[in-house]
Structure formats: C-alpha cells, structure tokens
Amino acid sequence: MCLVYQVKTSCFFSTHQGIEKFKGKVFHSSQWEHDYSLEGKSVASIGTGGSAIQYIPEIAKDVKQLYVFQRTAAWVIPRDERKYSNLSKALFKKSNFYRQIHRSRLYWSNESRVVPIVQPQIMKYGQKLAEAFISFQVKDKDLAKKLTPDFVMGCKRILISNKYFPTFNRKNVELVTEGIQEIKENSIITKDGKERPIDCLIYGTGFVTDPRIYLKHFTCIGRNQIELKQAWKNGAESYYGIMTKNFPNLFQLVGPNTVLGHNSIIFMIESQVNYILQLINLVEKSGQRAIEIKPEVQDSFNERIQTQLQGTVWQAGGCSSWYQAADGKNFSLWPTYTWKYWLDTRKVNPKDYLLLNKCSQSYAA
C-alpha cells in the first residue's frame, strides 16, 4: 500500500586543484573527525553558510590559526536566546495553557517573516538592522564590509548566530575572500599568490539538494517503468510535496516546494502526515489498492506555486542559492504562509485522485 523511503543527500565538496596531494586531515563538517584534535593546529575552513557558522566560533577557541575561506558573505541575524527563570520553568511544567501560549508566540513570530519574503521591498528595513548587527559585532570596518553580503537579505538562507561575527575579532582568525588557486601538500595558495600553511582542511560547504542529482543513487519506478529521477529531469514537482503523478502509492514528506525559509518544518510534516493518513483511509474504504494524484491537478498546482514564487525575495533578490536548481527554478520552498498549507491539506478532496485496483492499472480502466 505505501512505499516509505529516505533519501540521504550527498555532502557537497568543492573541487580544488591539488587536493589529492594534501597530506593533512580533510573532512566534511557532517562527517566530523571527532578523534582528531584541532588543538594547536592551523586549520582552513571552506564555506560560510549554515554549517560553517555553527562550528567556526567553537573551533576558533582551540586552533592555533583559523583561515575562513569565504566565497559569498551570508546574512546573519541575532539569535533570540535567553535563560528561562525558575518561575517560567515551573509554569511550563504545570500549565498546558502556558506552553500553548509560548508555542503560539513562537509560531506567529516566525510566520510574520513571510511578509518581507513575498514583498522584498519591505526586507530593506530588516536588512538595515542586519547591517547594524555586523557593524556592532565586528571591530574592523574593512572586515565588516567583507562580511556584508551584496544581495538582498533573504535571497539566500538567513542565518542565526550571536557568536559568528565576534569570532573574526580574534587574532588567530583570518577571513580569506580570495579564491583558492591550488592546494599543496601542506598549504593553500590563493589566486593572489599568497600561501598559507595548514594542518587540516574542513569543508563546511553544505549538501547536494537538487533531487535530480541525489536521485542518481536511488531507484523509484512508477507507471510505465518511468523512474522518479527521469520524471523530475526538468525539475522536481509534486502535489503539496506529498504525491507525484504517475507514481501511485508513493507518499512523500517534505517533498518539492514544501521546505521553509521562515518557520518550523515540523508544522509542515505534521500536516503532511495527517493528509497521507486520510489518503490511505480513502483507499481502504474504496476497496481499491492504489491511489494517484490526477496529472492535471498536479500541473495546475505547480503552475500556481511557481507563479507565486516569482515575486519573492528568493527569486528576485539578486543571488543564486540551494533553493534553486541550476536553471533557476525554485523546487524547494513553500511560497506563502504555513497556516495556508495546513488549511489546504486539512482535508483530502477525493475528486483530485484516481483510485485504482493495482498500481499498474491504466487511467482508462
């Protein structure tokens, strides 16, 4: 009845001339070498995205020298962190109402971020605050300028940290914005000819997110022996990220265009699980064995989603990001409020689906 699958995206490694000659330690941040001590080492970290900003402030305390190689600066905003009082802890423990109020505050605070995302002209006010945050935390003005992105905030993933920028005030940390020319046995040479000796190279370069790439290692066969990677060759598409035409009984969580740039993905997953359970119940009650989204329903949905995405900061912010495929199509993000997604998926419309007595049954049967 139901195919459950998990696809592990691949680590993204930059390719640099001479990497195969390097004699030091090399690893990706997702495959951290915990048995390898960085204490007293000269370390190069490539990348300044969501992975890198988490470990850079921590390893800077232990290493002899840290070189942070930045291709593109990232917008980083303050982390809303505080200590909870004993009174608050007691209320959380005893009062369900108090927990619900707190959860609602967090939810609606995050949900409000949709407004500047869909109306990029409003984002400039938030961007001014982010620029002030950089200036406040980074002492050197020239360095602060290098750490300031040249695209509209929100075009790439907005990062959250109170520790990242202050790290560059340390004497043992150097921001390197020159491109890498070559990696030698014990050093890195940048395009300006400068050579920096290193003992360890860490890739904080993220992951491969385009399904057309990572599905090369995964086989899912649908109607007429079509593989999912073939069906998605021109860009991943589905119906609310849950079902894909020509693939009966293939239920997905966090499928195409249901990743978020503003709120908790758990909310989306909960909505999807509820919807999938309704689909399974619909099949069981019908006495059939398979269910499939009608092609015209999926096509209409995706046309609407792509139209909504065009005016967002993700598409019009002046950058390229993992949100988009190489051709610029945004296959990742949900373009509006999560409560709208919840409302749309709260109840299945049976008219949108084909009920079949077997997965291979033709539409006309």
Locations of the language-model features?
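Short hydrophobic core segments
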Residues: 1-8, 43-46, 66, 180, ...
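Rossmann-like dinucleotide-binding core of oxidoreductases
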Residues: 7-141, 173-174, 196, 227, ...
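Central helical "cap/lid" subdomain
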Residues: 13-26, 189-241
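A conserved short coil-to-beta-strand element within the FAD-binding core of flavoproteins
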Residues: 32-35, 171-191
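Active-site proximal loops enriched in glycine and acidic residues that flank catalytic Cys/His/Asp
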Residues: 70, 177-179, 200, 205-206, ...
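Short beta-strand to alpha-helix junction loop
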Residues: 117-126, 152-163
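C-terminal active-site-capping segments
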Residues: 267-270, 274-365
